[in-house]
Design a protein with these regions (language model features):
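Ligand-binding "clamshell"
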Residues: 42-51, 78, 196-208
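C-terminal non-catalytic accessory extensions
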Residues: 322-400
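Mature extracytoplasmic/periplasmic domains
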Residues: 222-291
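Periplasmic-binding protein-like
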Residues: 61, 65-66, 157-161, 199-223
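Early extracytoplasmic/lumenal segment of secretory-pathway proteins
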Residues: 1-40, 175
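A structural signal for short loop-to-beta-strand junctions that line the ligand-binding cleft
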Residues: 18-32, 36, 48-96
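Ligand-binding pocket segment of bilobal, Venus flytrap-like solute-binding proteins
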Residues: 12-15, 20, 144-206
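A bilobed periplasmic-binding-protein/Venus flytrap-type ligand-binding module shared by bacterial periplasmic
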Residues: 93-98, 214-228, 246-247
Protein backbone atom coordinates (compact mmCIF):
# COMPACT_ATOMS: atom_id res chain seq x y z
CA UNK A 1 0.00 0.00 0.00
CA UNK A 2 2.83 2.38 0.87
CA UNK A 3 4.17 2.12 -2.68
CA UNK A 4 0.75 1.93 -4.34
CA UNK A 5 1.44 -1.48 -5.86
CA UNK A 6 -1.89 -2.40 -7.40
CA UNK A 7 -0.91 -4.84 -10.11
CA UNK A 8 1.88 -7.21 -11.04
CA UNK A 9 2.93 -8.44 -14.46
CA UNK A 10 4.77 -11.74 -14.74
CA UNK A 11 6.87 -13.07 -17.61
CA UNK A 12 7.86 -16.75 -17.61
CA UNK A 13 10.41 -17.30 -20.38
CA UNK A 14 12.27 -20.51 -21.11
CA UNK A 15 15.27 -20.62 -18.73
CA UNK A 16 17.77 -20.30 -21.57
CA UNK A 17 16.02 -17.05 -22.60
CA UNK A 18 16.15 -15.18 -19.28
CA UNK A 19 19.15 -13.12 -20.36
CA UNK A 20 17.61 -12.15 -23.69
CA UNK A 21 14.27 -11.40 -22.03
CA UNK A 22 15.79 -9.07 -19.44
CA UNK A 23 17.72 -7.26 -22.17
CA UNK A 24 14.75 -7.06 -24.53
CA UNK A 25 12.15 -5.85 -22.02
CA UNK A 26 14.57 -3.42 -20.44
CA UNK A 27 12.68 -2.44 -17.28
CA UNK A 28 11.97 -5.65 -15.37
CA UNK A 29 12.07 -5.12 -11.60
CA UNK A 30 12.52 -8.56 -10.08
CA UNK A 31 13.82 -12.01 -10.96
CA UNK A 32 11.99 -14.73 -9.06
CA UNK A 33 12.23 -18.51 -9.11
CA UNK A 34 14.34 -20.73 -11.32
CA UNK A 35 16.98 -21.92 -8.90
CA UNK A 36 20.37 -20.73 -7.60
CA UNK A 37 22.39 -21.64 -10.69
CA UNK A 38 20.21 -19.51 -12.93
CA UNK A 39 20.46 -16.58 -10.51
CA UNK A 40 24.22 -16.93 -10.18
CA UNK A 41 24.28 -16.83 -13.96
CA UNK A 42 22.29 -13.57 -13.91
CA UNK A 43 24.82 -12.21 -11.41
CA UNK A 44 27.68 -13.12 -13.75
CA UNK A 45 25.90 -11.25 -16.56
CA UNK A 46 25.68 -8.16 -14.35
CA UNK A 47 21.87 -8.08 -14.15
CA UNK A 48 21.42 -8.28 -10.37
CA UNK A 49 21.44 -5.24 -8.08
CA UNK A 50 22.18 -5.47 -4.34
CA UNK A 51 19.24 -5.46 -1.96
CA UNK A 52 20.04 -2.45 0.22
CA UNK A 53 16.74 -1.32 1.74
CA UNK A 54 17.16 -1.42 5.53
CA UNK A 55 13.62 -2.65 6.23
CA UNK A 56 14.05 -5.45 3.72
CA UNK A 57 17.45 -6.42 5.12
CA UNK A 58 15.90 -6.59 8.59
CA UNK A 59 13.38 -9.17 7.36
CA UNK A 60 16.13 -11.02 5.47
CA UNK A 61 17.95 -11.35 8.80
CA UNK A 62 14.99 -13.40 10.08
CA UNK A 63 15.64 -16.02 7.38
CA UNK A 64 18.21 -18.72 8.24
CA UNK A 65 21.45 -18.57 6.25
CA UNK A 66 21.04 -22.19 5.16
CA UNK A 67 18.60 -25.07 5.21
CA UNK A 68 19.68 -28.68 4.94
CA UNK A 69 23.14 -27.51 3.90
CA UNK A 70 21.82 -25.30 1.09
CA UNK A 71 22.53 -21.54 1.14
CA UNK A 72 19.43 -19.36 1.39
CA UNK A 73 21.27 -16.10 0.68
CA UNK A 74 23.96 -15.03 -1.76
CA UNK A 75 26.38 -12.24 -0.86
CA UNK A 76 29.17 -10.55 -2.79
CA UNK A 77 31.56 -8.29 -0.85
CA UNK A 78 29.01 -8.14 1.94
CA UNK A 79 26.19 -7.07 -0.38
CA UNK A 80 23.05 -9.22 -0.56
CA UNK A 81 22.31 -10.26 -4.15
CA UNK A 82 19.50 -12.74 -3.61
CA UNK A 83 17.51 -14.35 -0.84
CA UNK A 84 15.51 -17.56 -1.03
CA UNK A 85 11.75 -17.13 -0.93
CA UNK A 86 10.98 -20.86 -0.86
CA UNK A 87 12.71 -24.20 -0.38
CA UNK A 88 12.82 -27.00 -2.91
CA UNK A 89 14.04 -30.57 -3.00
CA UNK A 90 14.34 -32.82 -6.02
CA UNK A 91 13.04 -36.33 -6.47
CA UNK A 92 10.34 -38.12 -8.41
CA UNK A 93 6.59 -38.71 -8.36
CA UNK A 94 5.30 -42.27 -8.40
CA UNK A 95 1.84 -43.22 -9.66
CA UNK A 96 1.30 -46.17 -7.34
CA UNK A 97 -1.71 -47.76 -9.13
CA UNK A 98 0.14 -47.68 -12.46
CA UNK A 99 3.29 -49.03 -10.84
CA UNK A 100 1.31 -51.98 -9.47
CA UNK A 101 -0.62 -52.54 -12.69
CA UNK A 102 2.58 -52.65 -14.72
CA UNK A 103 4.38 -54.87 -12.21
CA UNK A 104 7.22 -52.43 -11.60
CA UNK A 105 9.25 -52.27 -8.37
CA UNK A 106 8.79 -49.26 -6.09
CA UNK A 107 11.72 -46.91 -6.79
CA UNK A 108 13.57 -45.17 -3.96
CA UNK A 109 16.79 -43.99 -5.63
CA UNK A 110 17.90 -42.46 -8.94
CA UNK A 111 19.61 -45.67 -10.02
CA UNK A 112 16.30 -47.53 -9.59
CA UNK A 113 14.93 -45.43 -12.45
CA UNK A 114 17.93 -46.47 -14.54
CA UNK A 115 17.47 -50.19 -13.84
CA UNK A 116 16.56 -52.86 -16.40
CA UNK A 117 13.34 -53.51 -14.45
CA UNK A 118 12.08 -50.11 -15.61
CA UNK A 119 12.91 -51.06 -19.20
CA UNK A 120 10.87 -54.27 -19.39
CA UNK A 121 8.00 -52.57 -21.23
CA UNK A 122 10.10 -50.81 -23.87
CA UNK A 123 9.47 -49.26 -26.30
CA UNK A 124 6.65 -48.19 -23.96
CA UNK A 125 8.17 -45.59 -21.59
CA UNK A 126 7.80 -45.87 -17.84
CA UNK A 127 9.38 -42.53 -16.85
CA UNK A 128 8.72 -38.91 -17.81
CA UNK A 129 11.40 -36.24 -17.85
CA UNK A 130 11.96 -32.89 -19.54
CA UNK A 131 14.68 -31.74 -21.86
CA UNK A 132 17.06 -29.67 -19.71
CA UNK A 133 16.71 -26.77 -22.13
CA UNK A 134 13.04 -26.63 -21.15
CA UNK A 135 13.19 -27.03 -17.36
CA UNK A 136 15.50 -25.62 -14.69
CA UNK A 137 14.23 -28.09 -12.09
CA UNK A 138 14.94 -31.11 -14.28
CA UNK A 139 18.30 -29.58 -15.18
CA UNK A 140 19.04 -29.52 -11.46
CA UNK A 141 18.19 -33.21 -11.17
CA UNK A 142 20.64 -34.13 -13.93
CA UNK A 143 23.29 -31.99 -12.22
CA UNK A 144 22.58 -33.77 -8.93
CA UNK A 145 23.05 -37.18 -10.55
CA UNK A 146 26.33 -36.07 -12.16
CA UNK A 147 27.69 -34.77 -8.85
CA UNK A 148 26.42 -37.72 -6.80
CA UNK A 149 27.82 -40.47 -9.02
CA UNK A 150 30.67 -38.66 -10.76
CA UNK A 151 30.92 -37.47 -14.36
CA UNK A 152 31.28 -40.79 -16.20
CA UNK A 153 28.95 -42.94 -14.08
CA UNK A 154 26.51 -40.07 -13.79
CA UNK A 155 26.09 -39.87 -17.55
CA UNK A 156 25.73 -43.65 -17.74
CA UNK A 157 22.87 -43.52 -15.21
CA UNK A 158 21.21 -40.58 -16.98
CA UNK A 159 21.40 -42.46 -20.29
CA UNK A 160 19.53 -45.47 -18.89
CA UNK A 161 16.97 -43.29 -17.13
CA UNK A 162 16.41 -41.46 -20.42
CA UNK A 163 16.08 -44.74 -22.30
CA UNK A 164 13.54 -46.10 -19.80
CA UNK A 165 11.38 -43.02 -20.32
CA UNK A 166 10.70 -40.36 -22.88
CA UNK A 167 11.51 -36.65 -23.06
CA UNK A 168 8.71 -34.13 -22.64
CA UNK A 169 8.68 -30.48 -23.65
CA UNK A 170 8.71 -29.27 -20.04
CA UNK A 171 8.32 -30.20 -16.39
CA UNK A 172 4.57 -29.50 -16.45
CA UNK A 173 4.09 -31.91 -19.35
CA UNK A 174 6.14 -34.56 -17.53
CA UNK A 175 4.01 -34.02 -14.42
CA UNK A 176 0.81 -34.44 -16.43
CA UNK A 177 2.12 -37.71 -17.83
CA UNK A 178 2.52 -39.34 -14.41
CA UNK A 179 -0.74 -37.90 -13.09
CA UNK A 180 -2.69 -39.24 -16.08
CA UNK A 181 -1.07 -42.67 -15.87
CA UNK A 182 0.73 -42.31 -19.18
CA UNK A 183 3.90 -43.24 -17.26
CA UNK A 184 4.53 -44.69 -13.81
CA UNK A 185 7.13 -42.16 -12.65
CA UNK A 186 8.18 -38.59 -13.37
CA UNK A 187 11.23 -36.82 -12.03
CA UNK A 188 10.11 -33.61 -10.35
CA UNK A 189 10.73 -30.72 -8.02
CA UNK A 190 9.10 -31.28 -4.64
CA UNK A 191 6.12 -28.91 -4.83
CA UNK A 192 4.88 -30.65 -7.98
CA UNK A 193 4.91 -33.81 -5.89
CA UNK A 194 3.10 -32.29 -2.92
CA UNK A 195 0.41 -30.78 -5.15
CA UNK A 196 0.04 -34.07 -7.00
CA UNK A 197 -0.49 -35.95 -3.73
CA UNK A 198 -3.36 -33.57 -2.89
CA UNK A 199 -4.95 -33.41 -6.33
CA UNK A 200 -4.26 -36.95 -7.57
CA UNK A 201 -4.57 -39.52 -4.75
CA UNK A 202 -2.40 -42.50 -5.55
CA UNK A 203 0.58 -40.37 -6.53
CA UNK A 204 3.48 -40.00 -4.09
CA UNK A 205 6.57 -37.81 -4.00
CA UNK A 206 9.82 -39.66 -3.25
CA UNK A 207 12.95 -37.84 -2.06
CA UNK A 208 15.94 -40.13 -2.71
CA UNK A 209 17.79 -40.53 0.59
CA UNK A 210 21.38 -39.25 0.47
CA UNK A 211 21.04 -38.73 -3.28
CA UNK A 212 19.52 -35.28 -3.60
CA UNK A 213 19.88 -31.70 -2.41
CA UNK A 214 17.79 -28.90 -1.05
CA UNK A 215 17.65 -25.61 -2.94
CA UNK A 216 16.67 -22.17 -1.83
CA UNK A 217 14.63 -20.65 -4.68
CA UNK A 218 15.82 -17.05 -5.03
CA UNK A 219 14.19 -13.70 -5.49
CA UNK A 220 16.39 -10.76 -6.53
CA UNK A 221 16.32 -7.10 -7.51
CA UNK A 222 17.30 -6.42 -11.13
CA UNK A 223 19.46 -3.50 -12.22
CA UNK A 224 16.86 -2.76 -14.89
CA UNK A 225 14.26 -1.93 -12.22
CA UNK A 226 12.66 1.50 -12.56
CA UNK A 227 10.93 1.05 -9.19
CA UNK A 228 13.67 -0.29 -6.89
CA UNK A 229 11.99 0.86 -3.67
CA UNK A 230 8.68 -0.78 -4.56
CA UNK A 231 10.49 -3.86 -5.85
CA UNK A 232 12.33 -4.28 -2.56
CA UNK A 233 9.06 -3.76 -0.68
CA UNK A 234 7.64 -6.68 -2.66
CA UNK A 235 10.67 -8.82 -1.82
CA UNK A 236 10.25 -7.84 1.83
CA UNK A 237 6.61 -8.94 1.79
CA UNK A 238 7.32 -12.23 0.03
CA UNK A 239 9.77 -13.30 2.73
CA UNK A 240 7.61 -12.00 5.60
CA UNK A 241 5.33 -14.32 7.57
CA UNK A 242 2.28 -12.99 5.73
CA UNK A 243 3.92 -13.36 2.34
CA UNK A 244 5.05 -16.89 3.10
CA UNK A 245 1.43 -17.93 3.64
CA UNK A 246 0.93 -18.04 -0.13
CA UNK A 247 2.95 -21.27 -0.21
CA UNK A 248 0.43 -22.92 2.14
CA UNK A 249 -2.39 -22.73 -0.40
CA UNK A 250 -3.24 -26.27 -1.51
CA UNK A 251 -3.11 -25.16 -5.12
CA UNK A 252 0.50 -24.01 -4.58
CA UNK A 253 2.05 -26.40 -2.01
CA UNK A 254 5.50 -24.86 -1.90
CA UNK A 255 7.87 -25.23 1.02
CA UNK A 256 8.10 -21.95 2.97
CA UNK A 257 11.53 -20.60 3.78
CA UNK A 258 10.24 -19.58 7.23
CA UNK A 259 9.39 -22.29 9.73
CA UNK A 260 7.42 -19.82 11.86
CA UNK A 261 4.71 -19.64 9.19
CA UNK A 262 3.61 -23.11 10.33
CA UNK A 263 2.77 -21.60 13.73
CA UNK A 264 0.17 -19.27 12.21
CA UNK A 265 -3.52 -20.29 12.01
CA UNK A 266 -3.06 -20.94 8.28
CA UNK A 267 0.09 -22.96 8.90
CA UNK A 268 -1.56 -25.16 11.51
CA UNK A 269 -4.00 -26.29 8.84
CA UNK A 270 -1.11 -27.80 6.85
CA UNK A 271 0.40 -30.49 9.09
CA UNK A 272 1.08 -32.49 5.93
CA UNK A 273 3.29 -29.76 4.48
CA UNK A 274 5.00 -29.23 7.83
CA UNK A 275 5.75 -32.96 7.98
CA UNK A 276 7.32 -32.72 4.53
CA UNK A 277 9.27 -29.66 5.70
CA UNK A 278 10.75 -31.63 8.59
CA UNK A 279 11.41 -34.69 6.42
CA UNK A 280 13.27 -32.51 3.93
CA UNK A 281 15.27 -30.96 6.74
CA UNK A 282 16.19 -34.42 8.07
CA UNK A 283 17.14 -35.92 4.70
CA UNK A 284 20.89 -36.29 4.28
CA UNK A 285 21.77 -34.44 1.12
CA UNK A 286 24.86 -34.72 -1.04
CA UNK A 287 27.66 -32.16 -1.17
CA UNK A 288 26.74 -29.98 -4.14
CA UNK A 289 28.94 -27.42 -5.87
CA UNK A 290 26.89 -24.60 -7.40
CA UNK A 291 29.95 -23.20 -9.15
CA UNK A 292 30.66 -26.56 -10.77
CA UNK A 293 27.06 -26.79 -11.96
CA UNK A 294 27.28 -23.29 -13.39
CA UNK A 295 30.53 -24.08 -15.19
CA UNK A 296 28.90 -26.82 -17.30
CA UNK A 297 25.33 -25.46 -17.45
CA UNK A 298 25.09 -25.01 -21.22
CA UNK A 299 27.31 -27.94 -22.14
CA UNK A 300 25.26 -30.32 -20.01
CA UNK A 301 21.94 -29.08 -21.36
CA UNK A 302 22.84 -29.22 -25.03
CA UNK A 303 24.74 -32.50 -24.77
CA UNK A 304 21.75 -34.13 -23.06
CA UNK A 305 19.40 -32.83 -25.73
CA UNK A 306 21.53 -34.03 -28.62
CA UNK A 307 22.53 -37.42 -27.21
CA UNK A 308 19.43 -38.58 -25.33
CA UNK A 309 16.46 -36.61 -26.69
CA UNK A 310 17.22 -35.91 -30.35
CA UNK A 311 18.13 -39.55 -31.10
CA UNK A 312 15.90 -41.07 -28.43
CA UNK A 313 14.44 -43.83 -30.60
CA UNK A 314 17.88 -45.27 -31.33
CA UNK A 315 18.86 -44.98 -27.65
CA UNK A 316 15.74 -46.95 -26.68
CA UNK A 317 16.43 -49.57 -29.32
CA UNK A 318 19.95 -50.19 -28.01
CA UNK A 319 18.97 -50.23 -24.32
CA UNK A 320 15.94 -52.43 -24.95
CA UNK A 321 18.20 -55.01 -26.58
CA UNK A 322 20.55 -54.97 -23.58
CA UNK A 323 17.64 -55.29 -21.15
CA UNK A 324 15.99 -58.15 -23.05
CA UNK A 325 19.18 -60.19 -23.31
CA UNK A 326 20.02 -59.62 -19.65
CA UNK A 327 16.57 -60.48 -18.28
CA UNK A 328 16.34 -63.52 -20.58
CA UNK A 329 19.58 -64.89 -19.15
CA UNK A 330 21.53 -64.38 -22.38
CA UNK A 331 23.90 -61.91 -20.71
CA UNK A 332 25.85 -62.25 -17.46
CA UNK A 333 25.83 -59.58 -14.75
CA UNK A 334 29.35 -58.58 -15.76
CA UNK A 335 28.37 -58.32 -19.42
CA UNK A 336 25.28 -56.32 -18.53
CA UNK A 337 27.28 -53.83 -16.49
CA UNK A 338 29.73 -53.46 -19.38
CA UNK A 339 27.05 -52.72 -21.97
CA UNK A 340 25.04 -50.51 -19.60
CA UNK A 341 28.13 -48.34 -19.11
CA UNK A 342 29.04 -48.37 -22.81
CA UNK A 343 25.57 -47.07 -23.64
CA UNK A 344 25.94 -43.86 -21.67
CA UNK A 345 29.60 -43.12 -21.00
CA UNK A 346 30.70 -39.70 -22.33
CA UNK A 347 31.05 -39.69 -26.10
CA UNK A 348 34.28 -39.44 -28.07
CA UNK A 349 34.61 -38.15 -31.63
CA UNK A 350 37.22 -36.99 -34.12
CA UNK A 351 37.79 -33.27 -34.46
CA UNK A 352 40.61 -31.65 -36.46
CA UNK A 353 42.45 -34.96 -36.62
CA UNK A 354 42.25 -35.50 -32.86
CA UNK A 355 40.05 -37.76 -30.73
CA UNK A 356 38.03 -35.57 -28.36
CA UNK A 357 36.03 -36.87 -25.38
CA UNK A 358 33.20 -35.12 -23.57
CA UNK A 359 35.08 -34.92 -20.28
CA UNK A 360 34.18 -32.53 -17.49
CA UNK A 361 37.11 -30.35 -18.47
CA UNK A 362 36.04 -30.26 -22.12
CA UNK A 363 32.47 -29.40 -21.12
CA UNK A 364 33.79 -26.50 -19.06
CA UNK A 365 36.04 -25.30 -21.87
CA UNK A 366 33.19 -24.86 -24.36
CA UNK A 367 30.44 -23.86 -21.93
CA UNK A 368 30.56 -20.10 -22.48
CA UNK A 369 30.75 -20.45 -26.25
CA UNK A 370 27.69 -22.71 -26.23
CA UNK A 371 25.90 -20.16 -24.07
CA UNK A 372 26.41 -17.44 -26.66
CA UNK A 373 25.43 -19.82 -29.46
CA UNK A 374 28.85 -19.57 -31.06
CA UNK A 375 29.55 -23.32 -31.21
CA UNK A 376 26.05 -24.64 -30.62
CA UNK A 377 25.06 -25.94 -34.05
CA UNK A 378 28.52 -27.47 -34.57
CA UNK A 379 28.46 -29.57 -31.43
CA UNK A 380 24.79 -30.47 -31.61
CA UNK A 381 25.49 -32.04 -35.00
CA UNK A 382 28.67 -33.77 -33.80
CA UNK A 383 26.98 -35.18 -30.69
CA UNK A 384 23.87 -36.38 -32.51
CA UNK A 385 25.96 -38.21 -35.10
CA UNK A 386 28.32 -39.72 -32.51
CA UNK A 387 25.43 -40.87 -30.31
CA UNK A 388 23.57 -42.38 -33.23
CA UNK A 389 26.72 -44.23 -34.31
CA UNK A 390 27.30 -45.57 -30.80
CA UNK A 391 23.76 -46.86 -30.38
CA UNK A 392 23.81 -48.46 -33.82
CA UNK A 393 27.14 -50.13 -33.05
CA UNK A 394 25.76 -51.60 -29.81
CA UNK A 395 22.69 -52.89 -31.66
CA UNK A 396 24.84 -54.56 -34.30
CA UNK A 397 27.30 -56.05 -31.80
CA UNK A 398 24.43 -57.58 -29.83
CA UNK A 399 22.83 -59.01 -32.94
CA UNK A 400 19.88 -56.66 -33.07
Amino acid sequence: KEYNITGLSFIGPNPVLWRQTIEAVGDLDIAWGGGPTLFDELISFGFVAPINDEETLAVVAEIPDEFGGAPLKRYDDGKLLWVASAISSFGFIVNEPVLNEWGLPYPQLWEDLASPEFGVLLPKPTIAYARPTQSTSHTRIYEIILQKFGWDQGWAIIARLAANGRPYSGSVEALSAVQSGEVAVSIAIDFYGYSSEVQFPGTKYVLPFNESIVNGDPIALLKTSTHPDAAQAFIRWIISVDGQKIWLDKSVNRMPVREDVFKTPEGRKRPDLYANYNATKANIGIPFDDNLALSIEYSMRYYFDAVFADVHDKLVQAWSLIVTKYLNGEMSQEEFEYWAYELGKPLSWEEDGQIVTFTLEFAQSINDALGTGELLSKYQKIWREAANARYQSIIEQLGG
